[in-house]
Design a protein with these regions (language model features):
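Beta-rich accessory regions
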Residues: 1-157
């Protein structure tokens, strides 16, 4: 179902930095590897379905609790739920976090470290373009690799 691919390579974000990786994403797959040892951010990850009104769903690693989170607190519509997946001591010691994130118009699925943990959540975006942004909160972020695949429609419009 992949239509085209954008390889961003390695990305470094400064303290509390933000980088838009796509201005309007309808259906995408994101493969991202974070260097946990070289990152200092308290929370770092992706703002999904980010719209001009400030709404988004946050897929992030929270260093303070050692978990990957899907946080819908900033959603404009629907439930504002919060899901987490803990990283094991071995995963934390490895110093690397692999995320595979699938996004469509109303859903976010996150596969942590090759599917060892999986998070799935509804994510209803506001009207207008739905950006995806790479974010570092209260520290820096070192991404070893980031690849975005635009996905074809399966024709259920």
């Amino acid at each position: 179902l992949r239509e085209d691919t954008v390889d961003f390579g390695a990305i470094d974000l400064d303290v509390s930095g933000e980088k838009t990786i796509v201005d309007d994403a309808e259906a995408v797959e994101i493969e991202m590897t974070i260097d946990l040892n070289a990152s200092t951010a308290e929370r770092a990850g992706l703002k999904i379905h980010a719209t001009e009104d400030g709404a988004y769903t946050y897929v992030a690693y929270d260093d303070q609790i050692g978990r990957v989170v899907v946080d819908r607190q900033a959603n404009a519509q629907g439930d504002r739920g919060y899901r987490t997946a803990p990283l094991s001591e071995a995963e934390l010691a490895a110093g690397e976090l692999k995320l595979r994130v699938y996004v469509d118009r109303g859903c976010v699925e996150v596969y942590v470290n090759d599917g060892r943990q999986v998070l799935s959540s509804y994510s209803y975006a506001s009207e207008g373009p739905r950006a995806i942004k790479l974010v570092a909160e209260s520290g820096t972020l070192k991404v070893k690799s980031l690849v975005l695949h635009h996905m074809k429609s399966i024709g259920l419009e």
